[in-house]
Amino acid sequence: MTGLEEDQEFDFDFLFEFNQSDEGAVAAPAEHYGYAAPGLGAGLPLSAAHPSLPAPCHDLQSSAAGVSAVGYGGTVDSGPSGYFLSSGGIRPNGAPALESPRIEITSYLGLHHNSSQFLHEVDVEDVLPKRSPSTATLNLPSLEAYRDPSCLSPASSLSSRSCNSEASSYESSFSYPYASPQTSPWQSPCVSPKTTDPEEGFARGLGACGLLGSPRHSPSTSPRTSVTEESWLGARTSRPSSPCNKRKYGLNGRQLSCSPHPSPTPSPQGSPRVSVTDDTWLGNTTQYTSSAIVAAINALSTDSSLDLGDGVPVKARKTTLDHSPAVALKVEPAGEDLGTTPPTPDFQPEEFAAFQHIRKGAFCDQYLSVPQHPYPWARPRSPASYTSPSLPALDWQLPSHSGPYELRIEVQPKSHHRAHYETEGSRGAVKASAGGHPSVQLHGYVESEPLTLQLFIGTADDRLLRPHAFYQVHRITGKTVSTASHEAVVCSTKVLEIPLLPENNMRATIDCAGILKLRNSDIELRKGETDIGRKNTRVRLVFRVHIPQPNGRTLSLQVASNPIECSQRSAQELPLVEKQSAASGPVLGGKRMVLSGHNFLQDSKVIFVEKAPDGHHIWEMEAKTEGDLCKPNSLVVEIPPFRNQRITSPVQVNFYVCNGKRKRSQYQHFTYLPANVPIIKTEPSDDYEPALTCGPMSQGLSPLPKPCYGQPLALPPDPGACLMPGFPPRPQGSASPELHDLSCAPYGSATAGPGHSPLGLPRPVGGVLASQEAPRPSGVPPGPPQPPPPTLLQPQVSPTSSG
């Protein structure tokens, strides 16, 4: 105190004419520190103390007058203290009262721990350094004289009062009181965000504080009035997100403790920041994850469905003296120890009926949901378009036709298209060689449901077709575009979806597709990428369609266009083969082949190459070109002979046109055919030979393992193999050359039905099969007449041929 009085820097008596008389000299210390006169009652209403304040301000503070004497009165150095200025128009020194706001340097002595009921006997003298009670703060007492207190400004709203609301604070479980004019009835709207020095700070988790009994509390309360054990012991971040969260001490160096006193002027409106407890916040969550979520919810609490003053934001609601009986502040008693604050039981449901919808979990659902985009696609896709959850990958090799379906490119794209970069505008859609744009049609589809045609950019090298790494399809829009399209991303590849409509015969004109060039460095640095962007500038338009089948499966067809050169430099320098007059030729060579394309020179070379399965070159030969017939768009080549003249099957090779060391065209295919291949007409052999079939034929013809190519009338080597059923078979182990009796059993014992032979064939007239007498084996003497033996059927011999 004495140090401050002796310091000339803080003596503003001359500036404000405090010491103009002897009486003022006596009252200077009290006036210098903003103390009221001893005779002024602490419970005097603010209207009497400050007649210059407007009526709304008096009304707001009338309810707090009863506690001002206890809450703010104290004794410092055996002198009376207060926080209310003297009433009347004449100041203690006899000077007239200033009508306009004035600046005072007031020594804020804080709340003495021996006389204030808000402080507890918690001794932290050993932990915290003592502060000198000579700290001066800036106070603007007559702020309300020119500002309507009913309309809270951002400076005096919740975000600037982090002791009452944590919407602007990163502290998740508690806040700190202010050893500044924030706790006085006269608050400055522009208080400094940092009233303590960095070295005066302490760890954020050492103290907890509730709401101080200030008559100027915020109309809304913080959800952090409930400090549970979990929230108290939780981890704290090192720095807050807002400078408004201040750490305060008493001027005696003691840390301020919690206050169990609620605000005397609670909010009349049901704020969502009241009674949001552990079990009502996100179900089973025991503590708020971060006050940033609460701040976001508070900022979004302007929805009319929450009954917050018809959609008026919380910070802009006008406070009145109508106390709502259904809303009360949730206050918990201070714990005996700073680290053992007991959890407080939740509110009763009957006391807070207005917040039952918050308990039901609708609070976060209403304010954290993202609305749908208000601008839908102008040309939406047909809802009947088929989409399968398990479609083949884009790098799968699919056929272009299957069964009755065929996907065909009716009009091929132009061989050159300048792709645009990401940093420049579009260069238009891909065009066709003869003008217009490419077109694709699905043949064989007779259903009435539309399908979706997928288009992506694929590779054009000699490897398997796959999505291109350096080029993507680009959707073109504009007045001249007649085809609807939609962009989609499939496995990091942009795909353009185009409807195929039955009314258009399942045909689509591709006037909505451009080509986008990606940056080489972005692609080349990918893991596993081996291609080089500047050497891979050719692409293909790949079209794919998925056709649903009646059995529930999906038939996927794919077709790729001719190569398209996307680089302007490459299109001007590299040769390009579009057509070739011959696709195959004999191994002897010597035939002519005409190539059509671009960038052909007089010294252009055509190289034929045969590759091994591993990619190595097995054979390479330069073809002879006719320079006198060479043109920039055509080239005449004589096919060279193949390396092996004795091939027995066609061999496929490749060839390319070369204009220089690194100026080569794409590989083209050519097939060598074997020379002097005899053309022999062969017929497949019949596995069923009825002429050599013997045995039971009631069940049809039986296959023979080995056909008999002897004379038609000769007996087989094993006569027992052709015996009818009823004859004993020949013993397998007998080596005797003696022949067995070949007499047939009576026909009645056969299994054949009447009118049919034992072989199942119709009987001729007389009941005897047409037969020829078999020659008698040599060495067998003639015996008595016997029944005719079974004969071999010859399908080529008619019954009349026996005569």
Curated annotation (Swiss-Prot):
Q: What's one GO-annotated cellular component?
A: nucleus
Question: Which Pfam families is this protein grouped with?
Answer: RHD_dimer (PF16179), RHD_DNA_bind (PF00554)
Organism (species): Bos taurus
Region Calcineurin-binding, annotated ranges: 101-106
What is the UniProt domain comment for this protein?
Rel Similarity Domain (RSD) allows DNA-binding and cooperative interactions with AP1 factors.
| Motif Nuclear export signal location, chain numbering | 291-302
MF terms from GO for this chain are: DNA-binding transcription factor activity, RNA polymerase II-specific; RNA polymerase II cis-regulatory region sequence-specific DNA binding
Q: What InterPro entries would the database entry show? A: Ig-like_fold, Ig_E-set, IPT_dom, NFAT, p53-like_TF_DNA-bd_sf, RHD_dimer, RHD_DNA_bind_dom, RHD_DNA_bind_dom_sf
* Subunit and interaction comment: Member of the multicomponent NFATC transcription complex that consists of at least two components, a pre-existing cytoplasmic component NFATC2 and an inducible nuclear component NFATC1. Other members such as NFATC4, NFATC3 or members of the activating protein-1 family, MAF, GATA4 and Cbp/p300 can also bind the complex. NFATC proteins bind to DNA as monomers. Interacts with HOMER2 and HOMER3; this interaction may compete with calcineurin/PPP3CA-binding and hence prevent NFATC1 dephosphorylation and activation. Interacts with TLE6/GRG6.
Q: Which residue stretches does the UniProt record annotate as biased composition, category Polar residues?
A: 181-195
Give the record's PTM text. Phosphorylated by NFATC-kinase and GSK3B; phosphorylation induces NFATC1 nuclear exit and dephosphorylation by calcineurin promotes nuclear import. Phosphorylation by PKA and DYRK2 negatively modulates nuclear accumulation, and promotes subsequent phosphorylation by GSK3B or casein kinase 1.
Its function, per the record, reads: Plays a role in the inducible expression of cytokine genes in T-cells, especially in the induction of the IL-2 or IL-4 gene transcription. Also controls gene expression in embryonic cardiac cells. Could regulate not only the activation and proliferation but also the differentiation and programmed death of T-lymphocytes as well as lymphoid and non-lymphoid cells. Required for osteoclastogenesis and regulates many genes important for osteoclast differentiation and function.
State where composition is biased (Low complexity). Answer: 214-231, 793-803
What are the record keywords, sorted? Activator, Cytoplasm, DNA-binding, Nucleus, Phosphoprotein, Repeat, Repressor, Transcription, Transcription regulation
Q: This chain belongs to which protein, by name?
A: Nuclear factor of activated T-cells, cytoplasmic 1
Q: Which gene encodes it?
A: NFATC1
Q: Where is this region: Disordered?
A: 181-279, 723-803
Q: Where are the sequence repeats?
A: 184-200, 214-230, 263-279
Specify where the region named 3 X SP repeats lies, as residue ranges.
184-279
Where does this polypeptide localize?
Answer: Cytoplasm; Nucleus
Q: Where is the composition biased (Pro residues)?
A: 778-792
A single BP term in Gene Ontology = calcineurin-NFAT signaling cascade
